[in-house]
Amino acid sequence: MNTGVQDVYNLVWKLVRALQDPQKYEGALLDSYDWERRPIGRSVAQSSLHNLRSHALDMDTALGMSAEKSPEENAAAVAPFFDRELPGHAEKREAVCRAQKTLDTEFKAPGTEVGWFYPSADFWGEGRESAHGGQLKPHGTFDTEFYHASTVPGHNLPHAWVEKEGTRRALRDLVPLSAFLLLVGRKDIGWTALAREEVRVEVVGDGGWVDVDGSWGRQRGVTEQGAVLVRPDGIVAWRGEWDSELAQRWPEVLDRVLYLQGAA
């Protein structure tokens, strides 16, 4: 179900654009739903099957349980795990601990739950330089156990609390449902001029929203002169520093993150 909800978040804003301008958006932008979500869905399915098998093959075996045994026999097999006075208590606890490591992919997997990302949305290849903010281990496998907050394009916008005029909000709650959000740290160097119908600008710092505990400053991946562009589904689309030519290149950046042309 969670994966299905993620699918909807990914697709609905793309459908809105395709309905508003079919000629412009019915191609690659809609196709990107498959490019982005299919690998995630496949990974979730494989993980779910692994977890299902692990319950029977690892945990049930460690506890000494079996579908072929009677309820009384299963209860007797499990009892030493809970009662240190019974023979085999230490061995049973050790076996369960070993089995639990196998089940960490189900019960201890924040990396899997919130660290997933869309490699196809990393248009400028930033993830290759940082192993996607650490979410990939040195040998290239996905770190299921730990979540590594990152603003590499394709990743979920990290959580941070912000506050303005007595109102506290989660940073992600600032993301509009049908427009991009440009999070900037300064409002005096040109970023606000990039605002348009499809891009809302919010300032975190410099008289705008207050970064309550500094977590956004630690996670944003750019300086306070930089900015992070977020899609309506909460996925980082672009990040960068201000330069004098950015305003001229901005339409190309937007076209790229909308799968309309090559990287700008």
Question: What are these model-derived regions, one by one?
Answer:
Residues 1-16, 29, 40:
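Extended, hydrophobic alpha-helical segments in both membrane/secreted and soluble proteins
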